[in-house]
């Protein structure tokens, strides 16, 4: 099938690779290069980098609302466009241009977690499961009818990065199935009940309040890992906590217990991966070797 691909971050790359292997990708649309790193040099998106490695033409318009951009898009003569974490709103002329419309790969069980951060929000909310939906796009935010859906369990120690990688691979597999069965799929309108929105993650959500229950702090650490990274102050230094599990232990909220376990309002969490500023992530034994925490140490955020 003759396709346009529209995506930008790492999550989109496996989908691009799968489509390139099985279909004709006539053009790749992604966000333009932006300043990044210490030198603030323009850095292309992961999708642009991979598309160029594959020899695919790349476009990164700052808007798709101009008549010129819409004419260029339509002139590609694609049968369908596949969209995954692209980063721009698609106006109606773009949605209407491909013969079979635009298909979106969304990382949640719609209508739950429409919007920008569905993977983070599913873990933060303590959802038992999530999944991938292939959706026929329309003008609303993730409101289109669902063509195909697959569920997956969220593991008790799974982080955003873990789930991100699994769902990315699932999306690549599912879109191939959807494209192959497009003539037979029946669009299923999303129900009005159960709609929730996955707002962008704010950095203010990352500071840990140790008076909260262990179950909530466990979800906060896993649901913000690796970015922006839940953090606490230890010995006056900000430390990111990247992996954890709920554990037994008693003490005042924030008390550091043996083995880098920290007491919460109720229960405790065992930190299994931590990162000091300017350092790489470390497991507890290595972390404590270079950053000993004397008996009576406390974790806090202010």
Curated annotation (Swiss-Prot):
(6S)-5,6,7,8-tetrahydrofolate binds at residues 108-111. SUPFAM superfamilies: FMT C-terminal domain-like, Formyltransferase. GO terms for molecular function: methionyl-tRNA formyltransferase activity. PROSITE patterns: GART. InterPro entries: Fmt, Formyl_trans_C, Formyl_transf_N, Formyl_transf_N_sf, Formyl_transferase-like_C_sf, GART_AS, Met-tRNA-FMT_C, Met-tRNA-FMT_N. Pfam families: Formyl_trans_C, Formyl_trans_N. The keyword Protein biosynthesis applies. It catalyses: L-methionyl-tRNA(fMet) + (6R)-10-formyltetrahydrofolate = N-formyl-L-methionyl-tRNA(fMet) + (6S)-5,6,7,8-tetrahydrofolate + H(+). Keywords: Protein biosynthesis, Transferase. Residues 276-302 are annotated as: Disordered. The keyword Protease does not apply. Residues 276-288 have a biased composition (Basic and acidic residues). Its EC number is 2.1.2.9. Attaches a formyl group to the free amino group of methionyl-tRNA(fMet). The formyl group appears to play a dual role in the initiator identity of N-formylmethionyl-tRNA by promoting its recognition by IF2 and preventing the misappropriation of this tRNA by the elongation apparatus. Belongs to the Fmt family. This is Methionyl-tRNA formyltransferase. It comes from Cereibacter sphaeroides (strain KD131 / KCTC 12085) (Rhodobacter sphaeroides). The gene is fmt.
């Amino acid at each position: 099938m003759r396709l346009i691909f529209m995506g930008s971050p790492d999550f989109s790359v496996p989908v691009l690779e799968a489509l390139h292997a099985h279909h004709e990708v006539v053009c790749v649309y992604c966000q333009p290069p932006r300043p990044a790193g210490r030198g603030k040099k323009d850095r292309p998106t992961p999708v642009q980098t991979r598309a160029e490695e594959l020899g695919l033409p790349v476009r990164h318009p700052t808007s798709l609302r101009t008549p010129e951009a819409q004419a260029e898009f339509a002139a590609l003569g694609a049968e369908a466009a596949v969209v995954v974490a692209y980063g721009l709103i698609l106006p109606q002329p773009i949605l209407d241009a491909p013969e079979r419309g635009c298909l979106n790969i969304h990382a949640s069980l719609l209508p739950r977690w429409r919007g920008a951060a569905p993977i983070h929000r599913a873990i933060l909310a303590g959802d038992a499961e999530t999944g991938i939906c292939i959706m026929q796009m329309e003008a609303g935010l993730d409101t289109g009818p669902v063509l195909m859906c697959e569920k997956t369990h969220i593991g008790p120690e799974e982080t955003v990065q873990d789930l991100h990688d699994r769902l990315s691979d699932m999306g690549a597999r599912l879109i191939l199935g959807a494209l192959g069965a497009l003539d037979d799929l029946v669009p299923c309108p999303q129900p009005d009940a159960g709609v929730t929105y996955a707002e962008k993650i704010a950095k203010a959500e990352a500071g840990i309040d140790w008076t909260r229950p262990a179950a909530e702090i466990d979800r906060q650490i896993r649901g913000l890992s690796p970015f922006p990274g839940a953090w606490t102050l230890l010995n006056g230094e900000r430390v990111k906590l990247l992996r954890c599990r709920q554990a037994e232990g008693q003490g005042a909220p924030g008390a550091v217990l043996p083995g880098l376990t920290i007491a919460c309002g109720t229960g405790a969490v065992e930190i299994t991966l931590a990162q000091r500023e300017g350092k790489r992530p470390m497991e507890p034994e290595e972390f404590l070797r270079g950053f000993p925490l004397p008996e009576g140490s406390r974790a806090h955020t202010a």
